[in-house]
Amino acid sequence: MKKTFLLGISFVSFLLHIGCQYRLVKPKELRTDLLRNPDHVKLNGEVQELMLNNEILSTNKYEISKIQTKTPLFNWVLDDKSKQSISYQLLVSSSVKLLNKNKGDLWDSGKINSTAFSQLYNGKELKTEKVYYWKIRYWEKEEFISEFSEPKAF
């Protein structure tokens, strides 16, 4: 009985140790053209609790950061628990709904083998005066894939 109990405790400890090694991580601090918060919507300089979308973009009521280039530069930071990425995948979509389904209708970079933390857009032509959304995930080791980041509008 005592051996069974000790074996059970050892097994649970082992599982907890393994579980700590395979943690849920995702990229953070996403930037578009080096802007940290291009998705913030402001009114008289105050950040509003609104998500940047095409309707807000078309009104002159709010202040926003407009990304006008057709090839924006995307940057990100690894999760604090990660050491180094060996590759990444970037998705750009015309709607947050598509992006939440992991569909990049404008660009799916596929797996890019690189340790870089930035990538120039290389998808379908972007139009000015339109809102787009992007997210990214990375591989830390060949067998370890992070979760996708939270979507970011630009």
Language model features: what each stretch is:
Residues 85-131, 144-147:
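Recognizes extended acidic, P/S/T-rich segments that occur
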Residues 8-14:
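Bacterial N-terminal signal peptides
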Residues 78-84, 140:
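Extracellular acidic, Ser/Thr/Pro-rich low-complexity tracts
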Residues 150-153:
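Terminal edge beta-strands and adjacent linker/stalk segments
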Residues 18-19:
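C-terminal motif of bacterial Sec signal peptides marking the signal peptidase cleavage site
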Residues 22-79:
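Pro/Thr/Ser/Gly-rich low-complexity, intrinsically disordered linker/stalk tracts
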Residues 1-4:
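Positively charged n-region of N-terminal signal peptides that target proteins for export
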